[in-house]
Each structure stands twice: as structure tokens, then as C-alpha cells.
Amino acid sequence: LIAEAMTKAERKDPIYIAFDEYNVWYRAKGEEGNEEVYNLEDALVVSTFLNIFVRNAHVVKMANMAQLVNVIAPIFSTKEGSWYQTIFYPLQLFATHCHGTSLDTFVDCDTYALGGERIPYLDVSAAYDNEAGEVIVNVTNRHREQAITTDILCQTGRFGGKATVYEVNGPDIKAENSMTRQAVKTVTKEAQARGDRFTYAFPAH
């Protein structure tokens, strides 16, 4: 649509897309008590949003989460204290690690039916950080019951050895965080990635 509009307007300078507000919001209603309490399911939705932004980085140049503290936010704050909601963790990982150039990805995995389409269980984006010499692969396994073992292939180079895995997960998809319990959080693991491929089992959510 943008390309068509630019052609009709005889405009040569590019027009990009900005998401001024995005987040998960489907429970709280009314003028008061609007604070959403997020669960692991919501964190998976946020990670999918972020994957979409990275995959379309050639046209999406800005995306702002709404809000940052309270109401619909990754941080929940009260008079007694504050804590990280589940959606904080994918946002933190993308902000900390997903830098550089967005890479094109090809995903071949099992699918599920939704709205007349077949949707892959693995939602994937990737980026290359030229300064750090690192490839960042972001994967969301949307299967509720099965871990998905996957070969990750590099077509134009080779992996250099140790890989760090940051996994956001919890006891079940309805798990929530609170001031006294972080049921959903990031766990760090190590993996080996040598040659042009490595294999990893992405856990169910």
C-alpha cells in the first residue's frame, strides 16, 4: 500500500511505519482498575510482536510500547514495591541483545490451523551485530505441549563455538508474576554451535 501511494504521489523519498503504541490489552475495562496482570501467554504475544518488528525492520523504523509502568506495562509498581511482569523479559532481551541488521529467515516446521491459514509453531526473527560479530536468533515456540527440536543453519558463514541461550518460560502459560514471586523469568543456558549449523530443542510453552 505504501509503495502504491508513493507511486501515485510521484514521491521518491521513502515512507516508513511507526507503531506509536503497542501492547497486550484485553482484560481490564472501565475508567478505574485498568492495571493488567500479565501471564506467560502474554509474554509470548509480546515476543511475537517484537519478531514481527525485526522481520520488517526495512519498513518499521519505530515501535513504542504502551505503557512502561502500571496500567498495561512491563513494570508494576505499588506503595509496597515494584516487580517485573512477564512481558518485561522478552522486551528486555530484545532491547539488550537484538542489535544490528535484520536477517531474512526461512522457517520449515510443523504448523497449526488459524483463520483458514497454516501458522508455523516456531515464530522466528534474526539479526547480525557487525560490531560484536554475533548472530542473534529470536524464537518463540507456540506449541503448548511439545518441545520442537530444530536445526539452525547458517548459509553464508560458520558459527564460532559457544552460544548463549536466554529462555523465557514458566510453569504454565497462565503463570503470573507478583511482588513475592517471579514465576516467569529469563533463564540463561550455554549451547555449542560449530560449523554451519547447530541443533536446539525449543521448549513448549
Where in the sequence are the language-model features?
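Short helix-capping segments at alpha-helix termini
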Residues: 5-12, 58, 157-158
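Short, glycine-/Ser/Thr-/acidic-enriched flexible segments
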Residues: 24, 67-70, 141-145, 155-159, ...
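Extracellular beta-rich ligand/substrate-recognition surface
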Residues: 113-118, 144-146, 190-191
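Short, well-ordered amphipathic alpha-helices
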Residues: 1-6, 48-50, 149-153, 165
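Short conserved micro-motifs at the rims of enzyme active sites and ligand-binding pockets
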Residues: 29-30, 75-76, 149-151, 174-179
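Carbohydrate-binding surface patches
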Residues: 119-159, 165, 205
